[in-house]
From Swiss-Prot:
Residues 18-121 bind DNA. It holds the Pfam family Trans_reg_C. GO terms for molecular function: DNA binding; phosphorelay response regulator activity. The lineage of its organism: Bacteria, Pseudomonadati, Pseudomonadota, Gammaproteobacteria, Vibrionales. PROSITE patterns: OMPR_PHOB. Residues 1-182 are cytoplasmic. This is Cholera toxin transcriptional activator. The gene is toxR. The chain crosses the membrane at residues 183-198. Keywords: Activator, Cell membrane, DNA-binding, Membrane, Transcription, Transcription regulation, Transmembrane, Transmembrane helix, Two-component regulatory system. Residues 199-294 are periplasmic. It comes from Vibrio cholerae serotype O1 (strain ATCC 39315 / El Tor Inaba N16961). SMART domains: Trans_reg_C. It is a single-pass membrane protein. This transcription activator controls cholera toxin, pilus colonization factor and outer membrane protein expression in V.cholerae. It binds to the 5'-TTTTGAT-3' tandemly repeated DNA sequence in the cholera toxin promoter region. ToxS interacts with the C-terminal periplasmic domain of ToxR, stimulating its activity. It activates transcription at the promoters for tcpI and tcpA and this is presumably via ToxT. It is found in: Cell membrane.
């Protein structure tokens, strides 16, 4: 069974590859369905597809109350499913456990009675965090520059000018502030890069899975093996390409999932037709999925 949804195309695909920083603690990668605790980057928390899509929608609309109906639309109906309300309640409960969040005193997902759910934690993208830290480092270097200018411009006023030879060590003392200022500028440039490398995981990288009709099919590194799904993936991409030829042919397909008999194919097109980007989800075991794609 396929699930196609216009909202998922407009909202989700516009953020392919974007990672979110939650409360300056977790890095959330919706493409690989993972959470990484920034204090312990060795531990990777793998989210279920439902929990990941819930968090994805909440992260794109922080502090906004998302109705239960909107969540049902985004997580299930757009994928071709109709589930009862208990499925959403269970998925929210599981997501809170992954985030180590409390229902009584939530730090991340807050229940708004009779309305829905709200992500109350601070949310930034990795790019926004880098820009903020770079700006902070630049601000730190400014006071030193101002002081140096003040010292160099404060010349004593006197009616009598006396030409007195300056000791050699004056040159050494004058060059010291310049050296210190250069070091501060160098630190300001390198600090954001060092912070990013040490505290944030790298942008999602991919490895090749197969090539179908000249279209590369990739999967995230460290992703569970998708070998059993290869026949289904190849058939689905081939069928998709038959209906999308010429300039509408995708330039890349990213395959994720594979667990719980669910496979997600993200069809990515060229920038000129990026509006065609779409996510297709197959819900079947690898053998039956071939029949679905036909």
């Amino acid at each position: 069974m396929f699930g196609l949804g216009h909202n998922s195309k407009e909202i989700s695909m516009s953020h392919i590859g974007t990672k979110f920083i939650l409360a300056e603690k977790f890095t959330f990668d919706p493409l690989s369905n993972t959470l990484i605790d920034k204090e312990d980057s060795e531990e990777i928390i793998r989210l279920g597809s439902n929990e990941s899509r819930i968090l994805w929608l909440l992260a794109q609309r922080p502090n906004e109350v998302i109705s239960r109906n909107d969540l049902h639309d985004f997580v299930w109906r757009e994928q071709g499913f109709e589930v009862d309300d208990s499925s959403l309640t269970q998925a929210i409960s599981t997501l809170r456990k992954m985030l180590k969040d409390s229902t009584k005193s939530p730090q991340y997902v807050k229940t708004v009675p009779k309305r829905g759910y709200q992500l109350i934690a601070r949310v930034e993208t990795v790019e926004e965090e880098m820009a903020r830290e770079s700006e902070a480092a630049h601000d730190i270097s400014q006071p030193e520059s101002v002081n140096e200018y003040a010292e160099s411009s404060s010349v004593p006023s006197s009616a009598t000018v006396v030409n007195t030879p300056q000791p050699a060590n004056v040159v050494t003392n004058k060059s010291a502030p310049n050296l210190g200022n250069r070091l501060l500028i160098l630190i300001a440039v390198l600090l954001p890069l060092a912070v990013l490398l040490l505290t944030n995981p790298s942008q999602t990288s991919f490895k090749p899975l197969t090539v179908v009709d000249g279209v590369a099919v990739n999967m995230p590194n460290n992703h569970p093996d998708l070998s059993n799904w290869l026949p289904s993936i190849e058939l689905c991409v081939k069928k998709y390409n038959e209906k999308h030829t010429g300039g509408l042919k995708p330039i890349e397909v990213i395959a994720t999932g594979g667990q719980n008999n669910q496979l997600t194919l993200n069809y990515i097109h060229s920038p000129e037709v990026s509006g065609e980007n779409i996510t297709l989800r197959i819900v079947a075991n690898p053998n039956d999925a071939i029949k679905v794609c036909e």
